[in-house]
Amino acid sequence: MPENSKLRQKVDPLTFKITAANHVLTNIAKKLPKNIAEKNNLELHVQEFLFFASGAIEVIKREINSRFEIFDKENVFYIYGLKKRLLDDGIQGKIKETISNYFSTPEYNYELDTKNSSLWRLQTLRNQAMHGNIIKIIRNKLHFKYTIRADKERVIIFVESTENPYRYFKQLFDELCNFIIKTKKIMNPNYKIKIKPLQI
């Protein structure tokens, strides 16, 4: 059996997903691409990162569901639906609040509020990547476009830009790790974090 296959059998799915996301994150450039080859390379590594990072969310989402038996394990469900079905008190209430602190849709009330939306943005980028390329460079900056519905009549599009792709996705990765740690510790106060470098 190849050495990589042996390694993957030794770690739990969540640890593997988050470790893989961290591994491919290091391949994301810290500068904007200068030519089409570098742009394609950046697209590749960003999509790899989003794949594994979203996979980690999928794993912990199903761990939460298994703990509280909210949905049938065979059903397809989203973290927003899970949050809606969680109770407002006790351990479920704490997990519900933690989900809200990371997955809330940005709110617009004269000003845009995205402070509780880091993993909403991550999942939005993953959805965009499933339907096409997401690397768009405009005026020497990398642009990411997000769409929200402000009310029944207004749709708001906002853009985040960066000159350092690695830093942008490192911030999302850090938020993902924080969410995982907080959620796991709510369910198991003795949980020992396993996010560390592994050979992949």
Regions found by a protein language model. Give the residues of each.
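Acidic, Ser/Thr/Gly/Pro-rich intrinsically disordered interaction regions
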Residues: M1-H23, N27-F51, V59-I200
